[in-house]
Amino acid sequence: MPVIARVAVQAAPRAIDKVYDYLLPQDMAAQVGCRVLVPFGRGNRTSEGIILTRTPGEKMPGLKPLLSVLDRGPVLDGDGIALALWLRQRYFCTLFEAVKTILPAG
């Protein structure tokens, strides 16, 4: 059964800021809280993102696969993700901007 990763994407502007679904390839070990590279938009330009959740699901046509994982382990835990969601609502920023404020530098 395919695994769907819900990702906050850096390239998403405020007007369409939401969580995007991507197919997690079977040979890719990506955990919640890991930074990833994803194809985004009609031109499939590569953008950084962070996995917020993983769920088993049905294979949907048109669902793009993750390109690669940037981290060996999660850089953000459940509390960090919850904080990013709160920051997004409170300070009118994109979800990825909120995530970037809590990630360690480097």
Regions found by a protein language model. Give the residues of each.
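Accessory, non-ATPase domains that flank or precede helicase/AAA+ motor cores in DNA-metabolism machines
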Residues: M1-G106
